[in-house]
C-alpha cells in the first residue's frame, strides 16, 4: 500500500509545489488552502499550525497536496474560485474565473445603472460567474447566458441555484448564433476564447493540462472568430443604442478596434486592466 506523504510545516508544503509555481505563488496557494479549508490564521500557519492538525485533517491535507503536486489548480482542488466577492463552484470542464474579468462585470453593472439597460446576454458563460454576478449586482436586469459546453452549463446552473441568482441558461454555439431569433438585448457581454495556439508555449503547464482547451484557444489564422460572430449577432440582436462588451487578448487590441468599426459599431473604446494591458472593448450599435 502506498504511504501518503506527511507534512509537518508550512515550508514543507509550499516547497513541494515549486515544480508548478514560483515561491511566492506556492506560498499563496498553500495559505489559501490552510486558511479556507482548515481554518488556520496566518499566525497559526507560521507558528507550526500544520503540525497541530488532527488525524482526519492531516489525511485531507495529504489528499489535497497529492492533487496539487500533480499540477491540479488550487481552485479545482478546493472546488471553488472567488469572484466578485462570492465563491463559484468550478471543476474540470469549466474555465477558472480570472481576477481581471471582475473589471468587466463592474463595467457592465455601471452601464446598467446609468441607462435603461434591462436585458443582458452573456455569451460563453462557463461557470456563470459573469452572468450571475450581474444578476445579483443589478437585480432589475434580466440576465440570460449561453454556452456550448454541457459540463459548463451544469456547473453554471448549480452556481446560480446556490447563489440564488435568476439567470436563464441555454446551450448555444456562439459561432452559430440564431440570427432568426426575435429576442432583443440591451447589453451583450462576452469573455470568449482568445488565446492563440502559438501562445501555448508561454502558458503554465498546470493550466494546459487541466483547464478546458475549448474555453481557451483559438486558431492562429483566425483569432477573432468568436468576436466577429458575436459582433455580427449583436448587429441583429441588440436594441438601438445597445452595448457590446468584450474581454479581449491584449495582443489583438488594435485588430479588435478595427473589427468593431468595420462591423459598423459606434463609440468603440479600448480600456486597460489593472496591469495597464488593453483588456476590454466597449461599443454601441
Model regions and ranges:
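Conserved Class I SAM-dependent methyltransferase catalytic core
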Residues: 220-283
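Conserved AdoMet
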Residues: 34-110
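Conserved beta-strand segments of alpha/beta enzyme cores
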Residues: 87, 142, 166-168, 266-269
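Short loop/edge segments at beta-strand edges and connector loops
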Residues: 78, 171-172, 272
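Active-site beta-alpha loop architecture of Rossmann-like, nucleotide-cofactor-dependent enzymes
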Residues: 75, 195-198, 251
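Mobile active-site "lid"/loop adjacent to the S-adenosyl-L-methionine
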Residues: 194-226
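Non-catalytic accessory regions of SAM-dependent methyltransferases
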Residues: 1-46, 53
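Conserved SAM/SAH cofactor-binding pocket of Class I
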Residues: 100-202, 229
Amino acid at each position: 500500500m502506498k504511504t501518503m506523504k506527511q507534512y509537518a510545516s508550512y515550508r514543507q508544503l509550499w516547497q513541494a509545489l515549486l515544480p508548478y509555481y514560483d515561491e511566492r505563488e506556492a506560498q499563496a496557494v498553500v495559505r489559501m488552502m490552510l486558511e479556507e479549508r482548515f481554518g488556520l490564521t496566518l499566525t497559526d500557519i507560521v507558528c507550526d499550525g500544520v503540525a497541530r492538525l488532527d488525524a482526519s485533517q492531516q489525511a485531507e491535507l495529504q489528499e489535497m497536496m497529492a492533487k496539487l503536486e500533480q499540477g491540479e489548480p488550487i481552485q479545482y482542488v478546493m472546488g471553488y474560485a472567488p469572484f466578485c466577492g462570492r465563491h463559484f463552484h468550478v471543476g474540470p470542464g469549466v474555465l477558472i474565473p480570472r481576477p481581471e474579468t471582475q473589471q468587466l462585470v463592474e463595467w457592465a453593472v455601471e452601464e446598467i445603472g446609468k441607462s435603461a439597460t434591462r436585458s443582458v446576454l452573456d455569451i460563453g458563460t462557463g461557470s456563470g460567474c459573469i452572468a450571475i454576478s450581474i444578476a445579483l449586482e443589478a437585480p432589475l436586469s434580466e440576465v440570460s447566458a449561453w454556452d456550448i459546453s454541457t459540463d459548463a452549463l451544469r456547473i453554471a446552473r448549480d452556481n446560480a441555484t446556490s447563489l440564488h441568482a435568476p439567470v436563464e441558461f441555454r446551450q448555444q454555439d456562439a459561432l452559430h448564433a440564431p440570427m432568426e431569433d426575435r429576442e432583443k438585448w440591451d447589453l451583450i457581454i462576452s469573455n470568449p476564447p482568445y488565446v492563440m495556439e502559438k501562445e501555448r508555449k508561454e502558458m503554465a503547464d498546470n493550466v494546459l493540462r487541466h483547464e478546458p482547451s475549448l474555453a481557451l484557444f483559438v486558431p492562429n489564422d483566425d483569432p477573432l472568430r468568436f468576436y466577429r460572430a458575436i459582433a455580427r449577432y449583436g448587429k441583429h440582436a441588440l436594441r438601438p443604442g445597445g452595448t457590446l462588451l468584450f474581454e479581449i487578448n491584449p495582443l489583438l487590441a488594435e485588430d479588435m478596434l478595427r473589427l468593431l468599426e468595420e462591423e459598423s459599431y459606434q463609440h468603440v473604446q479600448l480600456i486597460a486592466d489593472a496591469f495597464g494591458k488593453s483588456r476590454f472593448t466597449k461599443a454601441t450599435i
